[in-house]
Amino acid sequence: MFQVRDYSLLSFFYFMSTSTIITAAGKNSRMRKDQLSRGIELTNKLILPFNNKTVIETTIDNALSLNIDECIVVLGHYANEIKDAIFENYKDKVKFIENDPVDVGLSVSLYNGLSNSTSDFALCITADQPTVTAETFRNMIEVSQSSEDPYNTISILRRRKTGWLDTAEGLGMPFVAPRENLMRYLENENDNLNPILRKIFDDGYKFYGIKEKNEKELLNINHYDDYLKLLD
């Protein structure tokens, strides 16, 4: 199993440029529904407090700590609300782009982010993954870029098995992929990511499942109860 033993080795692999794409463009519909049913003030899940910051700020900071080439945040629904909360703190560190139109699938958001980058590889993250640590992201990058064929390899946070995978079922972000190759699969798609990842797998790409550092790394914040679990 791949695992980073010496992070100084990463500098060897960074001749292949890497960007981070963070998607923050969703409808927030399940969280809003839960907040309404509980009589809680409506607040976008990405700007809920977490570890003395907000959810999205924690995710961004984890990505920035990797010192990779660039960080791009893709906004869509509630773009103004999110930017009002975080823009001043990140305007010099992050490139913000906005979907137009906003009512598009996750694949479009990711494509728009990738198309605004010039890197060789992309670390693709959703903004509601603040518990995925920089260590896990580093493992993904190291596995991707030290593999025998980096441009035919995707390293991804595991959902079931770890190591080399025999299926892409159930997989999603975060993952590291060759940027231009991934864009070819996303172009003209308006869908969730798993069907596209399955197509990539069927075309012969090798997928490597990275083990989580702890259980919370596998938790996305879709419902209010998910958010409460993160605070435990």
Could you tell me what each predicted segment is?
Residues 120-128:
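Short beta-strand-to-loop acidic/aromatic patch adjacent to the donor-nucleotide binding site
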Residues 37-58:
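Short catalytic helix/loop segments, enriched in acidic residues and glycine
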Residues 131-225:
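Conserved core of the sugar-phosphate nucleotidyltransferase
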Residues 26-29, 78, 101-102, 127-130:
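Short glycine-rich anion-binding loops that position phosphate/pyrophosphate groups of nucleotides
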Residues 2-4, 12-13, 55-121, 135, ...:
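Conserved N-terminal catalytic core of the sugar/cofactor nucleotidyltransferase
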Residues 16-40:
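N-terminal nucleotide-binding beta1-loop-alpha1 segment
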Residues 20-22, 72-73, 123-124, 156:
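Structural beta-sheet core signal
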Residues 46, 93-95, 206-208:
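Conserved beta-strand segments of alpha/beta enzyme cores
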